């Protein structure tokens, strides 16, 4: 079956929001729990939803913590977000070649739109599924299924690209092929353990992979 659809995670995959996310967690947690959290303590919080993360920290303050996190994240967004090399050119080329492209993210829509506008990727994506659009987040298949439905695509014709195990397992649960990105903050070996179909060292690696898949 040929691949005609590529779904992307956003944070840590299409745009480098690592410092923004880490700073947002540290600001929020050190406001409420001074001197209890260091940088390495918040790395495991990258990937799950904010609700899941903050529920484990303090069930009674979840909404308060989310509000504090999002406010800092919003206020410091443009100064802390960076581009990844070859991302823009690769997505541009995929569109040129006629691929359907979508985003499946666990972020809220407002900050998703800020990131896409800042990176100028907003012109390429017709379908963006955020946490505001679904009941279940990755690795549950619902967000991917919703994106595929909106793109009128079948799972077996799609590839999910991401930097976290939620993306890889989410793709596997939805029945798509999967590609992990080696620039994940959690390290290449961490993602290899989830057995993605492909590992990308840079986003442009996608182009020959898709070309080979569609030739066979």
UniProtKB/Swiss-Prot annotation:
Entry EC number(s): 3.6.1.1
Known role: Hydrolyzes pyrophosphate formed during P-Ser-HPr dephosphorylation by HPrK/P. Might play a role in controlling the intracellular pyrophosphate pool.
Coiled coil: none
GO CC term, one of those recorded: cytosol
Cofactor: Mg(2+)
Signal peptide: none
Protein name per UniProt: Pyrophosphatase PpaX
A biological process term (GO) from this entry: DNA repair
Organism: Bacillus cereus (strain AH187)
Catalytic activity, reaction form: diphosphate + H2O = 2 phosphate + H(+)
Name of the gene encoding the protein in the UniProt record: ppaX
Molecular functions per Gene Ontology: inorganic diphosphate phosphatase activity; magnesium ion binding; phosphoglycolate phosphatase activity
InterPro entries reported in the protein's UniProt record: HAD-like_hydrolase_sf, HAD-like_sf, HAD-SF_hydro_IA, HAD-SF_hydro_IIIA, HAD_2, HAD_sf, PGP-like_dom2, Pyrophosphatase_Ppax
Family statement: Belongs to the HAD-like hydrolase superfamily. PpaX family.
């Amino acid at each position: 079956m040929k691949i005609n659809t590529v779904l992307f995670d956003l944070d840590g995959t299409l745009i480098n929001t690592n410092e923004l996310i880490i700073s947002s967690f540290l600001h929020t947690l050190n406001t409420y729990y001074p001197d209890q959290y260091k940088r390495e303590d918040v790395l495991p919080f990258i990937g799950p939803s904010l609700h899941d993360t903050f529920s484990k920290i303090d069930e009674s303050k979840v909404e308060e913590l989310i509000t504090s996190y999002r406010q800092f994240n919003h206020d410091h967004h443009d100064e802390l977000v960076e581009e990844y090399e070859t991302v823009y050119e690769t997505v541009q080329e995929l569109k040129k070649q006629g691929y359907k492209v979508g985003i499946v993210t666990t972020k809220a829509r407002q900050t998703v739109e800020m990131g896409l506008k800042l990176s100028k990727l907003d012109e390429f994506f017709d379908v963006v599924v955020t946490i505001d659009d679904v009941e279940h987040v990755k690795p549950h298949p619902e967000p991917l299924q919703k994106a595929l439905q909106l793109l009128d695509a079948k799972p077996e014709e799609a590839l999910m690209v991401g930097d976290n195990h939620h993306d890889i397992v989410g793709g596997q649960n939805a029945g798509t092929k999967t590609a992990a990105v080696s620039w994940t903050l959690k390290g290449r070996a961490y993602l290899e353990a989830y057995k993605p179909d492909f590992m990308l060292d840079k986003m442009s690696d996608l182009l020959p992979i898709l070309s080979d898949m569609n030739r066979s």
